[in-house]
Amino acid sequence: DTFAAMALPSLPPDRSVLSEPPRDPNSHIVDRRMMRRIVATGLLFFLFLAALWQYMFHMPIESVSEMFTADSVKVFFADIFKPKTTLHLSGYEMGIYFSIFVLMQFWNLFNVKYFRTHHSLIGDIIDLFRNPERVKASYNKYFLLIAAVIIVGQVIIVTFAGSLFNVEPISAEDWGLIILLTSPVLIIPDLYRFISGLRSKQR
């Protein structure tokens, strides 16, 4: 969160703001729509991470792929509320859990970046070939650098500083699966933004 809070203010101003009507000086900076988004996102993250935590205490995990086997899913729904659990998570399990948490926050960084901008990451990737100047104007090197630091820093922490965080290094395969598992945090909202942007242009 600290690095994300540093990355977002580094973004250049959006010129489209000049086309919007002035904000009511008596209105709150965090309006109802923004508050609903914050609460909904926080609640979804909490429920997912709480369920994952409970699941790991009932089912020993040695790789991310084990979480999606038929037996694992059966255990999740059959034993999730039973009091019998392991005494603690292993260092490898903690590494998986910690990395999932950080990657979810990383993807959400882009959701915050595109909030109320009428743009999307998918649209920006397409515009890299059609209108690269617009895309470059919406980013800067500091944002990209901090985003890279978050990812590289997480890999370094889990791989080389595990004893400080009670985690163990995880495999390259598990890193790939964690990226895929957490990417819907960005992909689903971004698809909605992209489709909404196309519809608004057609009006």
Predicted regions located by residue number:
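C-terminal transmembrane helices and immediately adjacent loops/tails
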Residues: 2-203
